[in-house]
């Protein structure tokens, strides 16, 4: 009788643990913050400033945990670069500057954009 009671209790516990374990994993995935991606490609232009600011604003309004800037530029105006760097430094959302795709560059003023991010990364 004791053996049967033990088997029944064990089976019930196994079923309960099996049932609730997947729910716990799913709830952890739902709470993960998203990342906003902004692509800046080509020579630095004044349009980039507004585009970058919209990306920062969107990251803040959606509660994103990260803003990723995909960068591929030969550079551009020093004044514009300074403005973009100030936007990145003032961002309340962490900024990753990712030089991509393979063979992309961040030359001249683009180098300073990469250095202004919280994290700098480059495609192989």
Regions found by a protein language model. Give the residues of each.
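Positively charged n-region of N-terminal signal peptides that target proteins for export
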Residues: 1-5
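Bacterial N-terminal signal peptides
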Residues: 9-22
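Soluble extramembrane regions of membrane proteins in the secretory/endomembrane system
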Residues: 19-124
